[in-house]
Amino acid sequence: MKIKSIVAICAVLAMSLVSFKPSDKEVQSEKPFGGLALYTVRDAMKDARTTLEKVAQAGYVNVESAGYNNGKFYNLSPADFKALLDEMKLTPISAHQGTANFDNIDQQIADLKTAGFKYFVIPVPPMGLFTFDQVNKRMAMKGGAKNLAEILDKLGEKCAAAGLQLLYHNHDFEFRKDETGVVPIEYLLENCNPKYVNFQMDLYWVTKAGADPVDYFKRYPGRFKIWHVKDMDDQGRFAPVGNGKIDFKRILDNKKLSGMQYYFVEQDACFNETPLEAIVISHKGLEKIGFK
């Protein structure tokens, strides 16, 4: 082959490589977005550094803690936990604080602020009000919705004074009438002061209760600042986002009405994959649905 021919072929190949670039859609799909509730990977968080690295690699940018104990997040001081998140380019948004009460609320608020969180989330009725029937695997609450509302308002007022926002996270039992005929979630929405208390809607548990998230958005617009996005399989079990039957597109179309500022993938239990595999599947599902 002549030298000129070889040069010509090389030139064509070079031009082909230069002209090739991924489409805008492909670039966008690689851009990190969305949040993960670390409860999903709670066991793996024993090795916080490695696990958070994998969370970031899966494409998430925001995180929600569910591992506060004795003044530490996942056995790290609030400052050290914040430093680790910064290193991984992950942003702390919300923290589930299941042990909050009137005696420790000030310390917990201080720790959340040091770690960089914005939202203080009450995951279940606090201060001994939550009950769980081990035999029937059924969650419930005692003490009544009025009592819970008063507690949340007091805790929320403390949070607001410190620059945090308090949210209450639902399960399914709040959507069932109690022994007095009251639907607890509706009582809370109608009686808690929105200056101090708003809500984190868990889309799976609302669906599990037989309720419609969009109906609640319409009835109580602007009150649902964070969503938990988790799917439901045909057996009613938890599933990676996009692998179940919940119509997230319809719900997402009503994002503005709901007041949603952030959302987090959460999967309480995994059945066909490990939690670290599930969060990758869910992130791809988010993108297909239209979350960003």
Residue ranges and their predicted role:
Residues 2, 8, 20-119, 126, ...:
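N-terminal pre-domain/capping segments
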Residues 11-19:
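Hydrophobic h-region of N-terminal signal peptides that target proteins for export
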Residues 22-35, 40, 45-58, 189-201, ...:
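Histidine-acidic metal/acid-base catalytic patches
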Residues 40-42, 67-69, 98-101, 126-128, ...:
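Active-site-proximal loop/turn and secondary-structure-junction residues that shape catalytic pockets
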Residues 47-50, 75-81, 103-108, 152, ...:
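Alpha-helical scaffolding within the catalytic cores
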Residues 64, 94, 121, 167, ...:
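Conserved beta-strand positions in the central sheet of alpha/beta enzyme cores
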Residues 90, 117-118, 164, 257-261:
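A short helix->loop->beta-strand "cap" motif at the edges of active sites that frequently abuts
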Residues 102-198:
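Active-site acidic/histidine proton-transfer and metal-coordination neighborhood
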